[in-house]
Amino acid sequence: MILTLGDSVTWGQGLLDEHKFDSIYSNGQLLPRIAHSGAVIGSEKDTSGQKVHPEIPVPYPSVWQQLQSVTDWNGINVVILNGGINDVSLTRILNPWTQVDQISQLTKQFCSGAMTALLEDLASRLKPSGRLLVVGYFPILSHLSSPANEKQPRLLMESHGVATSSVAMETTVDINAILPRIVENCLAFWTTANEGLKDAVDQANRSLSRAVCSFIDPGFTEANSLWAPDPLLWELTPELEAQDEVKSLRDHACQDAYGDLVHLPQWGEWYTCCRASVGHPNVRGAAKIADELKRAG
């Protein structure tokens, strides 16, 4: 049996079940998937009872809560997991006023420190032959990103709570001027996250005195980021709509969670929710990650 824990990447945001990388990798094996869009790594003391559709990005159940919800580990041979980006926060990463050093520091804290503790606990629950496959991250934006229009990156920022205009100052941010700073944040997160996850894997294996954990690099390059020459991520359409496979399903789930847009109960969350697939592996991207998982055995 293969168990999947983690955030939107391991959940397979925007993908039909047959296109999710854990489904491809499992090759028909029983596949409990507890991963959830928006999940933070959290801590072993998390007690949130928040429950919504896994396509809706919310912090809980955290990855710690996900693993603690499993009551029988006897039949689990492989655990696929990830975590860290939501602890760092996409709002920080996509904010041009966030310093690269801050992104790097927070990413190391969560992808290395917090993940190490999680892996050690998780490994203690597995049978001796069990394995943990830790999936890395990828560049959301890169130096090769060239949006079709400035509205696309503007909407990406706004949907994650980053202001692009000021009523008080009567100004609108020049997207072309600030995009390079956002790119640097995205690249800093990508490289530091994967270094941190590798370090967490190594530390956990050392403390366990056996090679239980493996790091799985998705193998994406800057050319595979949003609006790059060979994107392996879901993008926005020219009309600024999500382009994924389960948009209709997610739209209904978002409306159930946040209400009718006309009444504006939680407009920001609703808008983010409906476009939650943007920046996640598309069908080709998920297939590539599945290939990397298969190479790990």
Where are these regions (language model features)?
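Short hydrophobic segments within beta-strands
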Residues: 5-6, 11, 135
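Conserved SGNH/GDSL esterase-like catalytic core that processes O-acyl groups on lipids
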Residues: 9-109
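Short acidic/His/Gly/Ser-rich catalytic and metal-binding motifs that mark active-site loops
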Residues: 41-44, 87-93, 141-151, 225-228
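Generic structural signal for well-ordered alpha-helices
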Residues: 67, 115-123, 194
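Short, well-ordered beta-to-alpha junction loops that form the rim of enzyme active sites
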Residues: 83-84, 135-139, 218-220
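A short helix->loop->beta-strand "cap" motif at the edges of active sites that frequently abuts
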Residues: 126-131
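Mobile gating loops/cap/lid regions near enzyme active sites that modulate substrate access
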Residues: 146-191, 199-280
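Accessory beta->alpha helical hairpin/"wing" motif in late/C-terminal subdomains of nucleic-acid enzymes
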Residues: 281-285, 289
